[in-house]
Amino acid sequence: MNTEESRQKIVNTAIEMFNARGCKGVTMDDIAQSLHMSKRTLYEIFENKEALLEACLQLVQAQLKATHYETAKRVEEPMLLALYITKSMALSNHRYNRLISETKRYYPEVHSRFFALHTEEVRRMLQRGIEYAREKGYLREGIDAAEAVEQLYDLLQSLRIKENDNCDTYATQVGEKAYTYFRGLMTVDSIRRYEAHEDEYKHLIEEITTKNR
């Protein structure tokens, strides 16, 4: 196994362990033992736990970003794409809730460095979709795309993930809130168009749900 393969195996194992037991509850020694690897080998690849956590967050974000861009190629209706991205974010946040929340609590610099960038990228993607929908005449007059995204994030902040939350229940709550919010931005004609496409792309929502459950 070469260094890159070893690195990937370490990251995948660490994500599972951090998410199951928490970042504070897992030591570098624990990870080395789980992989039947010497501590020296582990520290040659990752100098400390912070570096390993960064790699874990990078992988989680890269997977989510790849899903967003792949979906953007397949979904033509901009407001449906915005809903899909919002729901997939919720599912990913639920799946990796403990990893993300404990990184934020115990390693705030690591969390802010990576999640600030990721959040900004998602905001820009949502904003571009809303701007495109506005240009096409799908939205009511006077809708500001940047403000709409900010209000959406404020709305979703009210849905805090609890440790015993069911993934599907949480994602449904987020999806329903986002759905109601997006409908409020649209004209009557665009709502009809939105609903006509909803069933057409329903399998995409089911696909992301299955992948992130």
List the model feature ranges, each with a label:
Residues 131, 168-213:
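C-terminal peripheral helix-coil segments that are non-catalytic and often amphipathic
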Residues 87-113, 127-128, 194-198:
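Amphipathic alpha-helical segments used for helix-helix packing
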Residues 71, 100-103, 159, 163:
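Secondary-structure edge/capping motif, primarily at the C-terminal ends of alpha-helices
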Residues 110-138, 146-157, 161, 172:
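Amphipathic alpha-helical packing segments from all-alpha helical-bundle domains
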Residues 9, 13, 17-51, 55:
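Helix-turn-helix
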Residues 55, 66-98, 149-152:
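Hydrophobic alpha-helical connector segments
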Residues 53, 57, 61, 104, ...:
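Amphipathic, non-transmembrane alpha-helical scaffold segments
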Residues 24-25, 139-143:
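Short, charged helix-capping/linker segments at alpha-helix termini
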